Each structure stands twice: as structure tokens, then as C-alpha cells.
Amino acid sequence: MHKSINIKNISDDKINLLDLNRKEIEIFLLSLGAKKFVTDQLMKWIYNRHCNNFNLMSNLKKDIRKKLNERSYIFASNFIEEKISYDGTVKWITSIDKQKIETIYIPEKKRATLCVSSQIGCSLKCKFCATGQQGFNRNLKVSEIISQIWQANKILKEKKNNSTITNIVFMGMGEPLLNLNNVISAIKIILDKNGFGLSKRRITLSTSGIVPALNKLIKKIDVSLAISLHAPNDFIRNSIMPINMKYNIKSFLNSVSKYLKHSHANRGGVTVEYVMLRGINDLNEHAEELGNILKKIPSKINLIPWNFFKNANFICSSKNRINIFANILRKKGFNTTIRKNRGQDIGAACGQLTGDIVNRIKN
């Protein structure tokens, strides 16, 4: 294991290399007088060997190591707390600006998924989601997104029998498309063969429907897409997801269709996320309506039993009602699954992430 550098007293004008994707690292290194191939060497040290001490990077020239020390540093925010569920799910908590964000690790037999946060809090105020009730502080930097993966990988290699992360989902705290540039840069690092080296189909970005940003994403990057729909019509969606009053279902799904036409990662269809709320969006007629609005969009529907959080005014649909709802959709030809609750006992399940946020949004 490599000895870590002391990051105290680092000047603000130094660059955290975890904020830079490949192209940006290459430009930075060229400015230091390094050759282009040094980009690969440096990224391997950072992401494959988890080394944040330039002095230990033995295949870099001494003068380049000196310049790197003078102009930059490598710092991944530490996890300050770990909670482990009876089902093996792990919640890691990171302190940023004296606030807390949450990262979830979900191990399964054939895969291991890391759910990362993209913002400190969330501004969308979806009524069924704990994160939305906490308010919003700021976007995470690229390094703060990447730190979650960097630290998780490090822990898994050291403590969990050399386990690896096979999938990364942007389904933690925040709306990824409201932090578009930083999320795209982070995804580039995740995709890079000398970064985390995941394929585009193993990275999932979930959005509640920020239509202009989704339209921009079409030209920027191709990853698996999940849409937080949660209602079959605008009337219901307006009542539980205020963002729908700005970007309604029709405009959202039109944007999704455009993305799918340009995507190789979504050949199997977009994942439609639908939280099950008793008496609100779970009736047979809602299933029929959902099938109708999705009939022209290749999709897989994931029904999510609602997870309780304090002061919420919802009740989860019964198992029987969820099964009936799922079967209606299956008869209409949709690949429909029911999400298994993971990490519910440690507040790590879908919609339960709260962190500790200083809200900067005025009501």
C-alpha cells in the first residue's frame, strides 16, 4: 500500500488532479514539459495503484515529479463513517464543507454496484424522496464525485477480498443533469481505460427530466439512461414531482426518444423508474396509462416499493398491488421488474439518502 501525502496547507492555486479527465491531464502535463505518454503513466498510478504521492511514481522523471508537487496534488475525500446492512449493502458517508453526502455499495452474486452522489442535497423537492426534503447546497466538484469511487475501490481491494465495482449508477444524492459538466467529466474518467475502465453500458445516469440538459447530453456522452418517471400523467406527476411543471412528461419523453436514437449503450431500452405509492399512482388504470405513454419508447420498467422516511405522508403499495401492476405492464409487452429493497435498515435504500445539508434555497 502506498504511503499517502499530507494534504494540509496545500495552496488554493494548486490543481487537484482528480478534477481532471484525460484530456485535461494531458494539457496540464504538456504545460509542465512532459511528453504525451506520461498521461497514461500518471493515470495508472492514480487510479490503478491508488497512489497520491508523486515521489513514489518511479517511472516519472524526477523533474516532472518535482513540477507535479509544485503545481498539483491528488486528494480523495475520505469516508468518515461506514454502515453495513444485514443484506451486505454498505453506506459510506463523506464530509464536505462540514456537510455529509452518502455513497452506497450494493454487492450481488454476479455484480457489485456503487451508487454515487452528484450534488450536496437536491433542489427538485420530489415529495416521495428524503434527499429532496433536505434542500440543496451546491454541486459536487469532479474530484468529489470521483473520490467516492476512488475510496470505495481502495477499501474493496484492501478489506473486501479484492472485490471490484462492476457498475456505477448516478442515483445518489442530487440530480446529475443539474451538474452536467462535472458529471460528464467524471464519466469520462470512469470510462477511461486508465481511469476506472468501465464500459458505457455499466454506467447508468438517472434523471428526473431536465430536458435542456438531456438534449445537450446527446452530443456529449453515451451511457445507460434511467428516467425517474413515477407517474403516468402530468396531473399526478405535478403533485409529487414539481419539476414536471417546468418540463412535462411529453417533453421529457421526446427528449428521451432523441437520446435513444443516438445511443449504443441503451440498445435494450431506457430504464423507467416508477415508485409505488398507495392510492396515488398504483391503480390498474395507472398501469394501463403508463403502458400507453411508453408504447413508442423501448423501455424496461422498474417498479420501486416506496421506502419510508421520517415525516413523509406516503404509504408503500402492497406487494399484491405491485404484482398486479407489474402483470398489467407485462401483458402489454413490457419487461417489468420489481426492485428488491437493499440497505433499508441503514437508510441506504432508494429515496432514503439524507446526508446533512445546509440548505441554500429560499422557499
UniProtKB/Swiss-Prot annotation:
Natural source organism: Buchnera aphidicola subsp. Schizaphis graminum (strain Sg)
Transmembrane segments: none
Cofactor(s) this protein requires: [4Fe-4S] cluster
The entry's keywords: 4Fe-4S, Cytoplasm, Disulfide bond, Iron, Iron-sulfur, Metal-binding, Methyltransferase, rRNA processing, S-adenosyl-L-methionine, Transferase, tRNA processing
Protein name: Dual-specificity RNA methyltransferase RlmN
Family, as annotated: Belongs to the radical SAM superfamily. RlmN family.
UniProt-annotated binding residues for S-adenosyl-L-methionine: G174, E175, S206, S228, L229, H230, N307
InterPro entries xrefs: Aldolase_TIM, Methyltransferase_A, RlmN_N, RNA_MTrfase_RlmN, rRNA_lsu_MTrfase_RlmN/Cfr, rSAM
Location of this chain's protein in the cell: Cytoplasm
Disulfide bonds listed in the record: C115-C350
Cofactor binding: number and manner: Binds 1 [4Fe-4S] cluster. The cluster is coordinated with 3 cysteines and an exchangeable S-adenosyl-L-methionine.
Residue stretches making up the Radical SAM core domain: 108-349
NCBIfam families the UniProt entry points to: rRNA_mod_RlmN (TIGR00048)
Cross-referenced Pfam families: Radical_SAM, RlmN_N
Stated role: Specifically methylates position 2 of adenine 2503 in 23S rRNA and position 2 of adenine 37 in tRNAs. m2A2503 modification seems to play a crucial role in the proofreading step occurring at the peptidyl transferase center and thus would serve to optimize ribosomal fidelity.
Primary localisation category: cytoplasm
Miscellaneous comment text of the record: Reaction proceeds by a ping-pong mechanism involving intermediate methylation of a conserved cysteine residue.
EC number in record: 2.1.1.192
Any one annotated GO CC term: cytoplasm
